[in-house]
């Protein structure tokens, strides 16, 4: 049976386990958002992934010297179900990367990589795109996307300037594990202190202790070893024989006639009388 100290510790460990499980669920990467673990800042790019109507926006980017224009989405596909970025070549869409929803910090640069596009000209690698996000609070649109360069007609670099690329203090509802654990520990300590201070007086008031001289039932022996010890203890106890007043000296108490006489006359006395 757990002691009074073990029960509170078990409750505390159970609460700590629940906190860690909840924290593990919170640590799953959010959609199109990232936290800078070195500074604690939080960036949410999800507003760039959908319009007010909920449909994914199409970001049109001029290729200028490349000779083609590009269409891309941020964490979504501009086609709804297709590549995250593409360009048109003689009426055919050429994929330059599949959808990815997890931005990352590369040093101090916030980037989002689309990989797994169509085959590159070398027929070995596949086309990919790198979106480089820049915090800009002065632009009058939700974002401005421009093409920075193309490498071997296989890798494409875009710059995305937006106010949504600016870091916020912290995500809403974000709390540290130590803070949550400390709060639970304080509540647990307060409840345990109240229980220790109030439980004993209430128990004495509503369930008064029995007096010491009140007869109590002795606990029955359990287990074969305890029963064996109890049997030999009873066998070793001295017994007092019962004699009839009319029995001759030396007459055994187990005599049938003496027992019948005892029942008829009820004239008995103990051997110590």
Curated annotation (Swiss-Prot):
PROSITE patterns: MRH. The chain crosses the membrane at residues 177-194. This is Mannose 6-phosphate receptor-like protein 1. It is found in: Golgi apparatus, trans-Golgi network membrane; Endosome membrane. SMART domains: CIMR. Disulfide bonds join 32-75, 120-154, 135-166. Residues 30-168 form the MRH domain. Residues 1-24 form the signal peptide. Its main location: Golgi. Sorting receptor involved in the transport of vacuolar enzymes from the Golgi complex to the vacuole. InterPro entries: Man6P_isomerase_rcpt-bd_dom_sf, MRH_dom. Residues 195-273 are cytoplasmic. Residues 25-176 are lumenal. GO terms for biological process: protein transport; vacuolar transport.
């Amino acid at each position: 049976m757990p002691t009074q100290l073990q029960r509170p510790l078990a409750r505390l460990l159970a609460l700590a386990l629940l906190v860690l499980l909840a924290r593990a669920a919170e640590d799953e990467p959010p959609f199109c958002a990232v936290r800078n673990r070195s500074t604690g800042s939080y960036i949410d790019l999800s507003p760039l992934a959908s319009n007010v109507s909920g449909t994914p926006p199409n970001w049109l980017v001029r290729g200028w010297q490349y000779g083609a224009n590009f269409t891309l989405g941020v964490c979504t596909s501009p086609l709804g179900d297709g590549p995250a970025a593409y360009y048109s070549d003689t009426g055919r869409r050429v994929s330059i990367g599949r959808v990815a929803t997890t931005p990352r910090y590369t040093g101090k640069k916030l980037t989002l990589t689309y990989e797994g596009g169509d085959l590159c000209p070398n027929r070995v690698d596949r086309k990919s795109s790198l979106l480089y996000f820049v915090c800009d609070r002065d632009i009058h649109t939700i974002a401005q996307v421009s093409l920075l360069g193309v490498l071997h007609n296989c890798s494409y670099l875009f710059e995305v300037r937006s106010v949504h690329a600016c870091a916020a203090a912290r995500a809403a509802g974000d709390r540290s594990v130590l803070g949550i654990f400390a709060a639970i520990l304080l509540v647990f300590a307060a409840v345990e202190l109240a229980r220790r201070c109030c439980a004993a007086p209430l128990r004495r008031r509503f369930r008064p202790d029995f007096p010491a001289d009140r007869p109590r039932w002795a606990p029955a022996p359990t287990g074969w070893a305890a029963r064996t010890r109890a049997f030999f203890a009873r066998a070793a106890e001295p017994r007092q024989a019962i004699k009839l007043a009319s029995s001759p000296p030396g007459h055994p108490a187990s005599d049938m006639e003496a027992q019948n006489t005892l029942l008829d006359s009820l004239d008995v006395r103990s051997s110590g009388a």
